[in-house]
């Protein structure tokens, strides 16, 4: 019974970290978010100032162990931080969620030499961010399911390393990262689950260039971009784990990726809920505030239920991912995001309805949150694919 307490009782460290994050959001994110979101050039939505300020207060590196200059936050605390960031802006939450998550993976998956080469440099650089290259134009959410196709981005063995050709797209932090974990097909004729290798990739490697920055409907304070490889040589010492066994790294080292995505979108749901409550107190209809109308009151309570339930699911998944001996269940690595994103989308539409016509006007700020709320219906796996994956885990023949 003692084991489950951390999910329900916030400790002093967590409280202090979240206060720091909330102050950072209020000072650095909230004042800038609308303006950055409105810039028509998608690359300009990204703010180096925000990243540098996050570095100053220790957010950027918090999942690094103290040995590497971080706080060594566990997955539960990290999820709380990711949600708190998203209350200020979804894109800001996503750029740090990716970086914090990949820093966790690197400390498990990289060998000692690779860690010594990468982690101190990442920790020192106030703009240092991380990215993971999986998604391709032809291979999207189907990588969550055992699928017979290979990755199209492929590598040929050569003396001392590999020659990589191909392209990744929709990559979060793709144009901003200094280090990448890149998943590439190294064995022809095998499905991606059997013939892919994970490489450590540096930003300045010859033959690797950034393609376009995607012009997204929402989540615009995060950049997503194409990674292009033209005869890019990656040396053998950059192979992560074993050649051909790259796919295992995803499942083995990072079961809580899904819950982190869920935490980002739950932060957006929280921001929408707060906006709906504030408006319902302010807006007079039929001679009294909206919040005194039973239908609206009940709906605000239902929003609260959906947010609390999503958060509990996320916290349980994160805690058990770090303590799998206490009953980790693989569906916890798939379903929290599906639940949280459905809840957030429902809350977004309700918030817009409660605002009436004002919810459709840009200057009230609801429209931005609605665009952001749509992002995770597909991000980190299309929900339908995730339900199928969960079913395959539940009913494995």
Q: Where do the protein language model's features map onto the residues?
A:
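A short, Trp-centered hydrophobic/proline-enriched beta-strand micro-motif
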Residues: 125-138
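Hydrophobic, small-residue-rich alpha-helical packing segments that form membrane-like cores
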Residues: 139-141, 147, 162
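A short core secondary-structure module
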Residues: 165-209
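Flexible, small-/acidic-enriched active-site or ligand-binding loops
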Residues: 204-235
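Long, acidic (Asp/Glu-rich), low-complexity accessory segments flanking structured domains
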Residues: 230-248
């Amino acid at each position: 019974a003692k084991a489950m307490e951390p999910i329900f009782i916030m400790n002093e460290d967590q409280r202090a970290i979240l206060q720091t994050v909330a102050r950072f959001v209020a000072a650095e994110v909230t004042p800038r978010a609308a303006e950055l979101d409105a810039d028509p050039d998608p690359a300009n939505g990204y703010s180096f100032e925000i990243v540098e300020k996050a570095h100053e207060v220790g957010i950027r590196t918090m999942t690094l162990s103290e040995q590497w200059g971080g706080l060594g936050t566990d997955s539960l605390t990290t999820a709380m931080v990711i949600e708190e960031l998203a209350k200020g802006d979804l894109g800001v939450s996503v750029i740090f969620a990716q970086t914090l998550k990949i820093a966790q993976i690197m400390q498990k998956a990289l060998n000692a030499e690779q860690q010594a080469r990468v982690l101190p440099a990442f920790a020192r650089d106030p703009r240092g961010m991380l990215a993971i290259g999986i998604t391709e134009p032809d291979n999207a959410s189907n990588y969550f399911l055992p699928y017979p196709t290979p990755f199209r981005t492929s590598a040929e063995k050569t003396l001392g390393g590999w020659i990589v050709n191909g392209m990744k797209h929709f990559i979060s932090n793709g144009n901003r990262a200094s280090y990448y974990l890149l998943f590439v097909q190294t064995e022809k004729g095998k499905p991606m689950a059997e013939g892919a290798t994970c490489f450590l990739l540096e930003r300045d490697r010859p033959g690797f260039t950034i393609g376009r920055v995607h012009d997204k409907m929402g989540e615009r304070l995060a950049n997503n971009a194409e990674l292009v490889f033209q005869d890019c040589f990656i040396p053998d010492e950059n192979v992560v784990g074993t050649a051909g066994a790259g796919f295992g790294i995803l499942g083995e080292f990072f079961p809580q990726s899904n819950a982190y995505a869920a935490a980002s979108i739950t932060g957006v749901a929280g921001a929408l809920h707060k906006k709906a409550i504030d408006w319902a107190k302010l807006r007079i209809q039929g001679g009294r505030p909206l919040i005194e109308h039973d239908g609206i009151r009940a709906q605000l309570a239902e929003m609260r239920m959906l947010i609390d339930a999503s958060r509990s699911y996320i916290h349980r998944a994160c805690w058990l991912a770090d303590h799998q001996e206490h009953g980790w269940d693989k569906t916890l690595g798939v379903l929290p995001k599906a639940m949280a994103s459905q809840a957030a989308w429902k809350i977004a539409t309700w918030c817009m309805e409660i605002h009436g016509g004002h919810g459709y006007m840009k200057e009230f700020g609801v429209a931005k949150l609605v665009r952001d709320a749509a992002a995770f219906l597909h991000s980190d796996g299309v929900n339908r694919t995730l339900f199928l994956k969960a079913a395959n885990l539940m009913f494995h023949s």
